[in-house]
């Protein structure tokens, strides 16, 4: 394989009212590396993550938690900047949806419960608590086009409607971003397996410049 995708010999046709020349063809390399550069760089990213998390997974104090819950956002972002360069990757928030804490409810924010201010649970003054559940999708794209997207979730309960709303949205986006950065490992593992088994028929990479 020459490592490049080619459309030579392809024949295109269009229906009534559509000109073939008006169609823009875009290669979507979602779920696979677009160049040798991304394979190498993602490998470096994984080595940094593994070194950082070695102590986490060898400490009983943390238990069996998902890695995205244990590694801080700023650590992953720092690793990404070191490995890909500050201008070598970008994030896109594809959507953020919120709803209150009641299953089946459609309103964005509402009172989830009332908690007695009296620690004894008596008839003391009541304080409103607002619970908001958020879901967000974040896409991470490297400069060669390699990309991945993940969904994150969050639940926030505070005395303020706006605070719960903002906190839930922010945490859902952060959760999605962390999962997306961590998911690059799966892309490389699958790529290695498919390459070994001659899975690709359109070339290994989609980038015109395999080495960036």
Curated annotation (Swiss-Prot):
GO biological process: DNA amplification; double-strand break repair via homologous recombination; double-strand break repair via single-strand annealing; mitochondrial DNA repair; regulation of DNA biosynthetic process; telomere maintenance via recombination
Record keywords, A-Z: DNA damage, DNA recombination, DNA repair, Nucleus
Pfam short name (any one): Rad52_Rad22
Gene Ontology annotations for the cellular component aspect, listed alphabetically: mitochondrial matrix; nucleus
Domain of life the protein comes from: Eukaryota
Compartment annotation: Nucleus
Keyword match Transport: no
Entry keyword Hydrolase: no
Homology family: Belongs to the RAD52 family.
Functional summary from the UniProt entry: Involved in the repair of double-strand breaks in DNA during vegetative growth via recombination and single-strand annealing. Anneals complementary single-stranded DNA.
Subunit structure and binding partners: Interacts with RAD51 and RAD52.
Listed name of the protein: DNA repair protein RAD59
Organism this protein belongs to: Candida glabrata (strain ATCC 2001 / BCRC 20586 / JCM 3761 / NBRC 0622 / NRRL Y-65 / CBS 138)
Source lineage: Eukaryota, Fungi, Dikarya, Ascomycota, Saccharomycotina
Gene: RAD59
